[in-house]
Swiss-Prot record:
Region entry Disordered, spans: 1-84
InterPro entries in alphabetical order: Tctex-1-like, Tctex-1-like_sf
Subunit structure: Interacts with ENG/endoglin, TGFBR2 and TGFBR3. Interacts with PPP1CC.
Ranges annotated as biased composition (Basic and acidic residues): 9-20
Residues with PTM Phosphoserine: S64
Main location: other
Protein name: Dynein light chain Tctex-type 4
Pfam families linked to this entry: Tctex-1 (PF03645)
Similarity annotation: Belongs to the dynein light chain Tctex-type family.
Amino acid sequence: MACRTLPSRRQEEETTKDLALKLPPGKPGGHLPSIDETRPIGPGPASRRGSLPGLHPSFSRRNSLAGPLVGPGGRRPSLGPVPPLGSRVSFSGLPLMLPRRMAPSYRLEPAPGEHWEAAGAQRALEAALTTQLNGVCYCGSEAGKLVQALCEQIHTRVRELNLPRYKLVCNVVLGPREGQGVHVVSRALWDAVHDGLASATFTNPSLFAVATVHAVYWE
């Protein structure tokens, strides 16, 4: 039968004293050391959340731009000039007209006296074409500006017919008179009861013009 020698009281006291020396001072014997307490003091390997070695102290994740690319206050510079708030710019760089804003009327049809009249609109088209094109000779380089002026003049004259809740779409076909034949055709998806169109033509020895206005009721 094997026998085991029991440690003496003096050996037990020395063992307990050695364990107490290994624990940090001021902590009870049953306290486990935290991660901060066991971390070695002094420079060591960088942690996972720390910065990468070799980077400048001013470098951070939220401020990746450095040098002259950073504006005042650490803001990132924009890619280009920002247009004023509320303005619209086309792809060609020219400003666009702002859309008309009207309060809802909660009506499904025009009010009395505000219905579309094709006869009155046609007279307005004929007057605009005669005023703008009388005595004008066709010039290919100036045709675009002339058509734009015609559309603006037609839009202004038709608006004078008391049509507050109609959207107007103006189209003008302009070309030289060289003995050719031209057919201008238009198709639209609309309400046949309240919407409508008007068309007028103009010719002189140098040019011809066909103007069309589509009027769509805006509920």
